[in-house]
Amino acid sequence: MARHEIGFRQACTCVLALWKLRVGVEAYYLAQVASGLDEYYTGGGEARGRWMGGGVAGLGLTGEVAPSDLRAVLAGLAPDTGLTPNGTTLSAHPRRVPGFDLTFSVPKSVSVLFGLGDRLVQHAVVEGCEAALAETLGWLEREACFVRRGTNKASNRQVWGERWGTRRMVANGFVAASFRHRTSRAGDPHLHWHVLVANLAQGIDGRWTALDGTAVYTAKRTAGVIFQTAMRRELTRRLGVDWGPIRQDSADIAGIPARVLREFSQRSTQIAEWLDNAGLSGPAATDAAILATRQRKQIAVDFAALETAWHARADALGWGPAELEQLLATTVAPAAEGYVIDEVTWHGGVRQVTSRMVGFDDWLTWLLDARVTAHDGAFTRFDLTQAIAATLPASTPIEVVEATVQRALASAAVIPIGDHWHDRGIVHASCRLIPDDRALRYTSRSLLAVEARLLAQLAAGIDVGVGVLDPESVEAAIAGSTLGADQAEAVRALTGAGDRVAVMVGRAGTGKTHTFGTLRTVYQAAGYSVIGLAPSARAARELADGSGIVSTTIARHLVDDARSTPPPSWWLMRPGWPASAIWLLSSIT
């Protein structure tokens, strides 16, 4: 059962999916549109698509999406002209990408609230989510709406000289059509929006060309976090709902029982069961499970009948209209928590670990250590934006998130690493070329301090006679093994160096785990305990299976270590403690 719960959580937390559109795919979205408002509520059609984005005005598009207009912009044409927006004939390109489908999904609890709520509740949910969607698309336009200028053709290199190569140019906004859908392929409430972004944008030089799609892909996860943050704020403001903890970028409405969420998550259950039966895990396996269990989506769906069935299923679980009404009646919107930009009133996520108010610098240090660099020593501006958006109170507007990011990057706690000018830059409205800091990587001052302490300890542990074995016993073990010449040399080096920490580096498949098996043999024969450590449970199992070493995860080791007095494994870094064990760390990079 626990494995199914994990699969359910993993399958439900993709808040923003991004796909390249195929030629002619717009027919799928247009076919699901209802003929009118009455059919939307009583029949099977979905809401009509609506134009979004700063680029639609340049094409004279507004309001509801007309099928002919959508077909035109996805083909790279201006509506009703048969020509490109530049007034030219479209050049045929066999691999042209019509656009991108940005699919924004809400947490299952929000879909359940929409599916079981009355018309007023449904309207409030849709209104709040669409406000968040518009805010997120605006953020994406500021951060990831670019066209390319220049050329990478080798034949033009001498002609163009220093101007050779492509550069990003700021565009005037996306040409996008938003379609709202209410159900999953399994017939459960699943509120989501398909935002079809045409591969067409106008640069600030006035010329219409294809988008720089790589920028959108880079910003995808951060945009998903921005959407979830804005959605929580909007639904709290409209309906007074409170939220549970944020896990994997998403949070559910507090008060809706887990059994109800599971009942209306048939797709997630199907995916989890497929993974369980296949014995697989990870993103690639999840993608395979999604495709393997995918049903053909019904276009003609009786939404009124579905609503009746949803209410019956919820009633059977003891969570009907009375419980929903009580949830909305007793949930009160919390007052805004302190996050004033120019004052020392920072609280945010720190309230989860302390009750005291803190200054911005202390708050930022906590955020960097606990949320940003806990699993990766370097981060980008987008990574920092995700952490700040997910940590500040639900009432925080996006402008405050962006201002907080800028203040954090200017803080002494954040250290840029690498070259500011490694990218060719972005052409802005002033026609000046400025650096693109989206790809710039940063680290934290506190992490550099930890690194400096670690390096000092490593230096102090060089050639101190720790773990040195009798060369004859080592040679005997090598002779009785199937090690190659380079593996045998690694065993000699590791058992004869005398350093507190010794490192063996090799590509995947070069036999590092097999070499560890021989190290286990010689060290155990010399009276040492040999224990393996790995960053994940899967890596620990592979280390144990391949080397015969009893292995665990680094996280589990740290928990167990903290309960020991003194922690026995710290002899590696504490010269005064006995060298009675050998700890082998596998796949740590």
Say what each PLM segment does.
Residues 1-375, 380-389, 403-406, 417-424:
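Intrinsically disordered, flexible peripheral segments
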Residues 279-287, 291-383, 387-577:
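ASCE P-loop NTPase motor cores of helicases and related translocases
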Residues 29, 54, 211, 514-516, ...:
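Basic, gly/Ser/Thr/Pro-rich low-complexity segments located predominantly at protein N termini
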Residues 192, 490-494, 586:
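Generic hydrophobic alpha-helical segments
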